[in-house]
Amino acid sequence: MRFVTSARRVSALLFVAVLSACGSGDGSQQSSTSISTNDVSFSAASPDASTPPAQILTATIDPEAIYVAVLHNGAAIASVTYSLSGDTAQIVVDPASPGGLGAGVFTGTITVVGYRCADPACSRLVSGNSQIVNVVYQIPPVVRFVAPYVGVAATADTAVIRGQGFQKFTVEGVTFGATAATTFTVVSDTEIRASYPALTAGTYPVQIQASSSPGAITSLANMVVVNAPAYAATTLAYPSAAPQVQALRYDAERQALLLAVNGGQILRYAYAGAWGAPTTAAVGSLSDIALSTDGQQLLALAQTALTQIDPATLAAGTVTPAPALAADVFLKNLAVANDGNAVVTTGYNGSSNTQTYLYATRSPAFSQPATAPSMDNSTPGGSADGSSIVLAQGSPALASATGVYRYLAASQTFSVTGVSLNQNSIAPALDRAATRIVLNGTNVYDAGYNFLGTLPSTTLAVVVKPDATRAYTFDSAASQVLSFDLTASPAGGAFPQIGATAAGDPGTGVRMAISPDGGTLFLAGNNQIAVQPAPP
């Protein structure tokens, strides 16, 4: 219960005059208060909307009242203030922030009471009638993201839908455009898992149906369905010789390859019937790149800032400086989760534990959750559905193994996995749903981080097929792309090789990426880029 009180201040002589005018002041009459309305309603389009403007009420107070109390309670109300002029009180009601409340229907009450003297000496007060104002505040759910946001034409699959308010109102259906999900499960107030049927290429707004919602449900999520690419095997040259490739990403929506290379450059190779010459953008001290959860931004991580870049034009947008970092600490790598956050690791010139951060892509800012671990030059790798990000750390030079962590987007928490090892130069690789995880390019684990088997120690780079049935490696001994059956029982602890294909020699420092359908591999090293249909 919250109180706003005020007394009418009068001089002693005037007070006596008022009492004289009041008669005996015996309290036989109640103070009478009236108000302009007894019902106030607020609404916001979603929990992400701005706070609605305050509303103003007018109360008329009995002229003989000497004291006014305004009481309020309930989650709908942030504050109540009022000013008194003569017998009129102007009451200002400020609603709570939608972001603080979340989705739902929230209530509150405001009580206005005037008090008058109960006896001629005014030694005690008597209350008059109470005016009660009922406040109702309605906030519908919001759909923020779908992950992966790219689907493959003619292929049924499952997506993770993230938002807020999914358990505040009964969700009766999920649609991708005009097509209903085949099944869906409300996992939590912020997550729905939905299966969708085979769709044709196009863009499909993702929406939920909840008839009890107090208003239209805002959705910011679009599923982009693309045809599986049919790229011929080829190689692509760099604009400058022998770059060090720091990151390689495939933009399936726009049919483009995006690379971060040393010297602070982003390279973009677009496909339009054939691969074109690269366009470039400069980002000083560039260390990593990743597409945002919705694919609308390319996140370019430099050692001292993160810049949002248009993935089609490479035009620079919002720049967010790094949090306050200790001397010799820098922003190192990032991976994107389905909650709209990027997990950002930091590094140190040497061996030392440094902070891990989250970066919010739609309201650009860094934060450090309570569960975020301090790690030794950690490298993240994420699943395509953004549900899980794995963080390996350490160095082969360390005497003892270091713990592997993960970030679970569903709970927005970091935790240890139970696996300990020292990372090498190969980043963690995961399938679409994080059911198969490859660490150090050789060790394969299931979703519970149970060790399953190994890949060759000659692996230089690895990706996992989205459906988790294959691992594809670039092998230093064979100078080929090798394929391994992850559904088979490892013989002697090693997964069986079932295929191989000759790739154009990418050189050293190889990075790999895979198309969403699992049919095309991309390899980039210091020599060139190789585009290669995946072996069986």
Can you describe what each PLM-predicted range is?
Residues V18-A21:
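C-terminal motif of bacterial Sec signal peptides marking the signal peptidase cleavage site
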Residues S28, I35-I61, V136-V171, P214-V245:
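Beta-strand/beta-sandwich contexts
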Residues L71-G99, A103-V105, F145-G215, L267:
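Immunoglobulin-like IPT/TIG beta-sandwich domains and homologous Ig-like subdomains
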Residues A230-S240, W275-A281, A315-L325, P364-P373, ...:
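A short beta-strand motif characteristic of beta-propeller blades
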Residues A242-R249, S285-L291, A326-V336, T371-G386, ...:
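Repeated scaffold domains used in trafficking and secretory/extracellular systems
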Residues L257, L298, A342-V343, I389, ...:
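Hydrophobic beta-strand positions that form the internal "hydrophobic ladder"
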Residues G263-I266, A305-L306, Y348-N353, G394-S400, ...:
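Short glycine/acidic-enriched loop and turn motifs that connect beta-strands
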Residues P506-P536:
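Blade-level signature of beta-propeller repeat domains, shared across WD40, Kelch, NHL, RCC1
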